[in-house]
Amino acid sequence: MIHCRSMDSPIGPLILAGHGSVLTNLQMVDQTYEPSRVGWLPENGAFAEAVSQLDAYFAGELTEFAIELDLCGTEFQQRVWQALLTIPYGETRSYGEIAEQVGAPGAARAVGLANSRNPIAIIVPCHRVIGASGQLIGYGGGLNRKLTLLELEKHQVLTSLTLFD
């Protein structure tokens, strides 16, 4: 049984869904690809930790999530999403770099398609994938949100650096 709840965030309302405390979906309410929500039931408090971690992320206090995920997709999508989880907070990779990482050189467009089907936005950080020349390309939640997330992470990385040790 899939349970869901919404939460407010600096990038707009988010929908969390899953079974037990295991997250299967984290979506922006108006993103371009949304899963069917038929049969989803209100959650019973099981996502309190996920909401707490997301709040801490948006406050700049959390750089790595510790939430159990259940990613459902094709074998290729799974490989791409696992690769996304290796991109450090505050850093970016190109679609081509991810294609190379998953053993599919030249499949940058396929990586983009897998990103567009990422069921767990933000936590599986598809927003950290950019074009080869550094430009922002494609994001199911819109380029403004992608830029906001990248700026949040970059700001936190820059403010945590010390000039002199």
From Swiss-Prot:
Q: Which InterPro entries match?
A: MethylDNA_cys_MeTrfase_AS (IPR001497), MethylDNA_cys_MeTrfase_DNA-bd (IPR014048), MethylDNA_cys_MeTrfase_DNAb (IPR036217), MethylG_MeTrfase_N (IPR008332), MGMT (IPR023546), MGMT_N_sf (IPR036631), WH-like_DNA-bd_sf (IPR036388)
Give GO BP annotations, semicolon-separated. Answer: DNA alkylation repair; methylation
Alphabetical list of Gene3D superfamilies matching this protein: Methylated DNA-protein cysteine methyltransferase domain, Winged helix-like DNA-binding domain superfamily/Winged helix DNA-binding domain
* Record field: catalytic activity: a 6-O-methyl-2'-deoxyguanosine in DNA + L-cysteinyl-[protein] = S-methyl-L-cysteinyl-[protein] + a 2'-deoxyguanosine in DNA; a 4-O-methyl-thymidine in DNA + L-cysteinyl-[protein] = a thymidine in DNA + S-methyl-L-cysteinyl-[protein]
Q: Does the keyword Translocase apply?
A: no
For this protein, the Enzyme Commission number is: 2.1.1.63
Where are the catalytic residues?
C126
Keyword tags: Cytoplasm, DNA damage, DNA repair, Methyltransferase, Transferase
One GO MF annotation is: methylated-DNA-[protein]-cysteine S-methyltransferase activity
SUPFAM superfamilies, per the entry = Methylated DNA-protein cysteine methyltransferase domain, Methylated DNA-protein cysteine methyltransferase, C-terminal domain
Q: Which GO cellular component term is one of those annotated? A: cytoplasm
Where is it localised? Cytoplasm
Enzyme class per UniProt = transferase
Q: Which family does it belong to?
A: Belongs to the MGMT family.
Q: What does this protein do?
A: Involved in the cellular defense against the biological effects of O6-methylguanine (O6-MeG) and O4-methylthymine (O4-MeT) in DNA. Repairs the methylated nucleobase in DNA by stoichiometrically transferring the methyl group to a cysteine residue in the enzyme. This is a suicide reaction: the enzyme is irreversibly inactivated.
Miscellaneous field: This enzyme catalyzes only one turnover and therefore is not strictly catalytic. According to one definition, an enzyme is a biocatalyst that acts repeatedly and over many reaction cycles.
The protein, known as: Methylated-DNA--protein-cysteine methyltransferase
Organism of provenance: Mycobacterium leprae (strain TN)
